[in-house]
Amino acid sequence: MSMNVTNPNIAKTSMRGLTNFISDLRNSPSKENEEKRVTKEMAHIRKEFKENKNIDGYQRRKYVCKLVYMYMLGYELDFGHMEAVTLLSSTKFSEKQIGYIALGILLNEQHEMLPLIINSFKEDLLARSDYFQSLALAAICNIGGKEVAEFLSPLIQKLLIANTSSPMVKKRCALAILRMNRKHIGLVTPDSWVERLVSVLDEPDFGVLTSLMSLLIELASENPIGWEPAIPKVIHLLKKIIINKEFPKEYVYYHVTCPWLQVKLLKFLRYFPAPDDSQGGKVLGEILTAVFAQSESAKAGTVNHKNSLNAVLFEAINLIIHLDNDPVLLKQTSLLLGRFITVKETNIRYLGLEAMSHFASLSNETSIMIKKYQDTVLLSLKDSDISIRRRALDLLYGMCDKNTCKHIVAELLSYLQTADYAIREELVIKIANLAEKFASNYSWYVDVILQLITTAGDFVSDDIWFRVVKIVTNHEDIQAYAASTVFNALQSRNCHETLIKVGGYILGEFGHLIADNPQSSPLVQFNILHSKFNTCGAPTKALLLSTYAKFVNLFPELTQQTQEVFKQHQSYIDAEIQQRACEYLNLTSLNEDLMQTVLDVIPAFIDAKDNSNTTSNTANNSNMINSQDSKISSGGFNQSPQPSQQQQQQQPPQQQQAQLQQNVSSNGLDLLDPFGLGLGNQQQQQQQPVQQAQPVYQQQQQAESFSPVQSDTVSSFGQQQQQQQGGFSSPTIQASSSPISSGGSDPMQIKILASYKRLCLVSEGVLYEDSMLQVGLKSEYQSGQGRLMLYYGNSSAFPLTNFNVTLNSIAGLTLQPQSIAPVIQPKAQLQQPVTFSCTSEFTESPVITINFLTPGKPITITLRLPIVISKFFEPLRLSSGDFFARWKTISGKPLEIQEIFKSTKPIDIQSYNRVIQEGLNITVLKQVDPNPNNIVASCLFPFGSNGQPINSYIRIETNPQANMCRLTIRSQSATLTNTIKNLLISHLQ
């Protein structure tokens, strides 16, 4: 092929027609005139392309440029693409360049024309022209899809390692591979690439090396395993540049040798442990020492000189912190960082504080090294730049230990009074964590939290004051002190509502410990709390009503005052307050023994290993630099107390009162938590069998929503075996590294099945959770349409790479998931919106397959999404006569199914009604069957396969004494009849 590329520029002759056209559009007096001009020009160009068979390269180039310009103005194009493809075949650079520019603007990765130009890409890559190869590589980066990447990546790899390729082409090859791998994770694997990419590190051109290191850093960040062979050559390059001073003069930037390459080489080493061989470790130590020496000997220069020098220096510091194996270098690092945090330049101080935060988290020795800079860091809290203040706060958090805790917490409390609102929430979280983590006595911890509430109550989350009441409840030696301290704090005229909550709880439980003091007598305690009542919100008022009920049990002399309050709120507008008032009034009036049983002092919580400190998850969201700080140290005080067995069956506040009499009179059930704090251990709840007195659906409503604050799932189905009937199949899990059978005896399978069943009844919660991954969802449904938000949380300490989710539609249900990022960083979360629509009956839930890589092994998880047909049911309310009239019109199989089954737990009709109506969206019809042990229900499915809505009618006859049920379903669709049967048996059995 002959190449006419003497001057790689666009044609010397200007395209006057294009210039005039652009001028006409810019000078158009109105939008209408512009549209007329565009329409006229499009018609002319279309005619030329269609009729003029002898159009030359110049005209084709000019017309394509006009089309591209019109497209950039927002006008749609339905022609001209093939003319741009024709320009790609030209041997003239000016024409080929316009062709690539046009296709880069007009096409995208999913365009149907893309496969047609793959051969053009290939021909230009094989050409002997550097400029043609560069154009093709740029286009592949911009519009190349997965098919293009897989087809051309071997050819690009050959160009990268070929001795005949120019440095310009090699640089673009490395960057093209980087771009393709970012869009299609897993394209570049160590097995087939490491040897060839490492060989390019011998390239003498520093531009090629800089581009290649960008690629290697990206690959190592995804998964460092397999890329270790590059380490010796990277160390050799650093030695060559820093120690041997072997480098091209043109790569010296303001007296610093190739700072960009040095930074990339040092950064690459941070993804790997220290070199195994002693020689490599020794050379690396010499290199880092030389970097420090260069910074010491460097004279003050221009801003560019300082920036380039500091860039290398900070990367070397980060590498030393990562390796953590040379005491001499660590000491030098502490001295350098101490110097950096005192300079005037804000950016350097910021980087110094950030690096010192990482340095402090290494060990006790490194933390001690920087103790002498504590006063300097405290001064940084008063810096005018909020980013400096945030870094200083993080550093103080990392520097804190048992010896300095009280001083640092006192300084932070003082600073809290004047701190910006933007930083107060983070500051409160850190103070609370430090106070709990390093508390030498509990009274000091209580004082700190109360001071936090007084100073910045709006920023104190519920987690913090929940933690206070747990600790006070668990330690008798501070209960009187806490009650006295809270009582004194409540005497202030302006009390924050959070303080009132704490006061209400602690005085309700332990107010009797200070009642002997005339200044804090029972009546005084009641009056102080009630004086705040009208200023509080509904949740706090509900808690105070519980406190008043506790007062009646502790101080009978307050019965009249508290009952007056209960009577006043029997008709309160808020349902929760009204319900509590009514039930507490009856409870305190009818049976003293019952009242004493229900309102007894809450028992101590059982200590159990907790996954986080007071608010560690929230603190992590505030960029707390030491991940270890979010973990709980050993010892009872720093562990999260869990409730005793007596508290493991507590219900949410909205449901406590409705079940009050039944709960207390039932054998084996636990006392209520009148304050509604939900302080129980959900993991222990999961192990408890479902009791008759607690309806299944009420338990399911306790399930937590999936959020960055991770928590244990609550299984409301206990150890039930899965149903293998019909279409209601098990939400099985399969992992390629450790296959798990679908049998119901496996603990993981039981947990997954329980989560799946629960989410079939509620709209949000956790679907799957193990030590690496947590999958949660939130859903909503309306008129045959649904929206699902899937959450993928990385619970591990390493990134999950090649993260890919496959969701396939099923017959009757169309799913449209959005794409997600391919990597989940440690302790981070991805969200994936999914929209779906129901078109006809469907029997099974759709399957979601999750694939990702962990260090050392690939993982595949297959689950069923809790999208069941009942989510699309609509109410069908019928009178007794209408129901039986319609019932009689359907009979016989397959439209009628009858099945007898035995319940695995005591039959509770109210619980069944809630599961059927609130969970499965099936309308329970009242006063249709005179037998109170029978249930009659109906539902409407609007999307029948014949285009007509389908009515379904259900009867459930129960025998509570024998724990037997007979289920009869009649429907206008055999498929729907069988599906409803499986759903009901699964959730009622």
Curated annotation (Swiss-Prot):
A Gene Ontology term for the protein's cellular component: clathrin-coated vesicle
Q: Which GO terms describe its biological process?
A: clathrin-dependent endocytosis; hypotonic response; intracellular protein transport; intracellular water homeostasis
SUPFAM superfamilies in the record, alphabetically? ARM repeat, Clathrin adaptor appendage domain, Subdomain of clathrin and coatomer appendage domain
Q: List the disulfide bonds.
A: none
Question: Where do the HEAT repeats lie?
Answer: 112-149, 188-225, 368-402, 403-440
Membrane-topology descriptor: Peripheral membrane protein
Check the record and name the Pfam families matching this protein: Adaptin_N, Alpha_adaptin_C, Alpha_adaptinC2
- For the region Disordered, give the residue spans: 610-745
Bias category Polar residues: which stretches? 624-638, 704-714
Keyword Nucleotide-binding present in the record's keywords: the answer is no
What's an example of a GO molecular-function annotation for this chain?
lipid binding
Q: Which family does it belong to?
A: Belongs to the adaptor complexes large subunit family.
Tell me, how does this one assemble?
A: Adaptor protein complex 2 (AP-2) is a heterotetramer composed of two large adaptins (alpha-type and beta-type subunits), a medium adaptin (mu-type subunit AP50) and a small adaptin (sigma-type subunit AP17).
> Per its database record, what is this protein's job?
Component of the adaptor complexes which link clathrin to receptors in coated vesicles. Clathrin-associated protein complexes are believed to interact with the cytoplasmic tails of membrane proteins, leading to their selection and concentration.
What is this protein's name?
A: AP-2 complex subunit alpha-2
Q: Which gene encodes it?
A: ap2a1-1
